[in-house]
C-alpha cells in the first residue's frame, strides 16, 4: 500500500475518531525530564506472544515507547509501517521500539506479523484498560460506535491518544511527541524519534 493511501485512510479515520471532541478530554502527558513509569505487558512480535518488560529493555539502551489508537487503522498502520522500514536505523542507535494500544493480544498477534505493518520487526503490547497509558498521563478515549478498521471489522475497544515517549537508559523521558497537541502526522513520530535516539 502506498504512503498516499495510508495518509488518505488516516484522514478518514481521524475524522471519524474526532468528530465529537466534546466527548473526549485532552490528555496531559508526562513531560521531558520525568522518570518513565516501568511496566510489564502482554506483547507480540512476529505473531509470538511474550511478556514485554520496559525495565529489561532499558538495560540494552534507549526505548521508543509509542502509544497509538488502534491496529489496522490508517494512521496507525502508516506509523507501524514506517517504524518497520526504519527499524535497522533504530537498532544501529541501540534503541528498542515498543508500541502500545488498547487492542487485545489476538489482534496484535496478527498485526505484529503482518508484512504491511509491523512486519515482525518490533513488538506491540496490549493495554486494554488503558492502565499503562494512564501512568504516562494519557486518558483512554471511549469506544466510538460504527468505527471499523481497514479490514471492515468493528473496532470495539477504546483509543489511546497517539503519543510517543523517547526514554533514555537512565529511565528519563528525553522527548515527547503528541498528535493531539503537536499536530504531527503518524510517520513524523517515527522520524522525530529516530533523530533523538541517534543523538543519545
Pin down the residues of each PLM region.
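Chalcogenol-based redox active-site neighborhoods
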Residues: 24-200
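Bacterial N-terminal signal peptides
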Residues: 9-21
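Bacterial N-terminal signal peptides that target proteins for export
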Residues: 1-11
Amino acid at each position: 500500500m502506498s504512503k498516499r493511501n495510508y495518509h488518505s485512510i488516516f484522514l478518514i479515520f481521524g475524522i471519524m475518531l474526532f468528530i465529537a471532541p466534546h466527548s473526549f478530554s485532552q490528555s496531559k502527558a508526562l513531560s521531558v525530564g520525568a522518570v518513565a513509569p516501568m511496566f510489564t505487558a502482554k506483547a507480540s512480535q512476529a505473531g509470538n506472544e511474550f511478556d514485554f518488560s520496559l525495565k529489561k529493555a532499558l538495560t540494552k539502551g534507549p526505548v521508543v515507547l509509542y502509544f497509538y489508537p488502534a491496529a489496522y487503522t490508517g494512521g496507525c498502520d502508516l506509523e507501524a509501517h514506517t517504524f518497520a522500514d526504519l527499524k535497522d536505523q533504530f537498532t544501529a542507535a541501540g534503541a528498542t521500539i515498543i508500541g502500545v494500544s488498547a487492542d487485545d493480544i489476538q489482534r496484535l498477534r496478527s498485526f505484529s506479523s503482518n508484512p504491511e505493518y509491523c512486519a515482525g520487526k518490533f513488538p506491540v503490547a496490549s493495554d486494554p484498560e488503558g492502565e499503562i497509558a494512564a501512568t504516562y498521563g494519557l486518558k483512554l478515549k471511549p469506544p466510538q460506535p460504527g468505527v471499523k478498521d481497514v479490514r471492515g471489522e468493528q473496532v470495539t475497544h477504546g483509543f489511546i491518544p497517539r503519543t510517543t515517549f523517547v526514554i533514555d537508559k537512565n529511565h528519563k523521558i528525553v522527548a515527547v511527541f503528541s498528535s493531539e497537541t503537536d499536530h504531527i502526522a503518524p510517520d513524523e513520530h517515527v522520524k522525530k524519534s529516530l533523530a533523538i535516539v541517534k543523538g543519545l
